[in-house]
Swiss-Prot record:
Pheophytin a binds at residue 126. The D1/D2 heterodimer binds P680, chlorophylls that are the primary electron donor of PSII, and subsequent electron acceptors. It shares a non-heme iron and each subunit binds pheophytin, quinone, additional chlorophylls, carotenoids and lipids. D1 provides most of the ligands for the Mn4-Ca-O5 cluster of the oxygen-evolving complex (OEC). There is also a Cl(-1) ion associated with D1 and D2, which is required for oxygen evolution. The PSII complex binds additional chlorophylls, carotenoids and specific lipids. The modification N-acetylthreonine is found at residue 2. Its EC number is 1.10.3.9. Photosystem II (PSII) is a light-driven water:plastoquinone oxidoreductase that uses light energy to abstract electrons from H(2)O, generating O(2) and a proton gradient subsequently used for ATP formation. It consists of a core antenna complex that captures photons, and an electron transfer chain that converts photonic excitation into a charge separation. The D1/D2 (PsbA/PsbD) reaction center heterodimer binds P680, the primary electron donor of PSII as well as several subsequent electron acceptors. The modification Phosphothreonine is found at residue 2. It catalyses: 2 a plastoquinone + 4 hnu + 2 H2O = 2 a plastoquinol + O2. The gene is psbA. The record marks 344-345 as: Cleavage. It comes from the Eukaryota. Tyr-161 forms a radical intermediate that is referred to as redox-active TyrZ, YZ or Y-Z. C-terminally processed by CTPA; processing is essential to allow assembly of the oxygen-evolving complex and thus photosynthetic growth. It is an enzyme of class 1 (oxidoreductase). This is Photosystem II protein D1. GO terms for biological process: photosynthetic electron transport in photosystem II; response to herbicide.
Amino acid sequence: MTAILERRESASVWGRFCNWITSTENRLYIGWFGVLMIPTLLTATSVFIIAFIAAPPVDIDGIREPVAGSLLYGNNIISGAIIPTSAAIGLHFYPIWEASSVDEWLYNGGPYELIVLHFLLGVACYMGREWELSFRLGMRPWIAVAYSAPVAAATAVFLIYPIGQGSFSDGMPLGISGTFNFMIVFQAEHNILMHPFHMLGVAGVFGGSLFSAMHGSLVTSSLIRETTESESANAGYKFGQEEETYNIVAAHGYFGRLIFQYASFNNSRSLHFFLAAWPVVGIWFTALGISTMAFNLNGFNFNQSVVDSQGRVINTWADIINRANLGMEVMHERNAHNFPLDLASVELDSIDG
């Protein structure tokens, strides 16, 4: 009898816990994805803050020349970064217990791998949590689908690219200047500006910004008049009021006359689907481009593609970009390589010829 009562009590405790986790009445929805999201994101955030402030220099290139990234080692907010895991570690899973000491783990850039893996798991769970809450509220799943674009981009930069290049040391440093350094090196090694998927991503981001600004300005400008013709339309409203003032018919008419009739939407759902889909699809393509360039399927190469009747090269913008790429590659890992890979791989007989 005692055992039966204990089993019922424990079952009720578990049931209450499940109900609390999945309740949509909580101020912040937790959900089963949140059970994993909360500790992973807290871990990633905590280690990032500590490492950004106090992590010792990291031997990123695996050549016993550590690079300092933390504030206590001479950096500021702009130059500081979490330095990627050493090339000596490569793609090995490198938790603290795999190193002989904490000092060795820090020297080899262990915090970077810890932060990145916990962060990616956390943001993936956040996406799952969005779907879970939508499901419990009877909504459609497109919020999570839209969020999959930045999740895919982060996964491409922090996981797929290092896998393709063979080392976490090729991942993006976690800092402002580190991000720009990663972009410059990526251009030098993969010619990303000439990759069509990157072009689609640029169109998605800048186009999304343009459409967002156009939509916001139209909504705030299309007022349902509550004043007489002799008064300003603004007099009937106050900034930030909750009541809707938007008239989609007026906005449609304005925009149709500004450009042409079929450039505007007269259906609110179609309009907002377009506003969501344009940047999401663009960023999906960018993530796909990063993932293909990770395995060295690079941007278009039009170097020395225009010649005259005598076979002499007529330089184009592509040749200027190629020269800039070589210059950036020379500056990158200057102590690890004598020449850029493009120059080091030239056949000797072609030089002699």
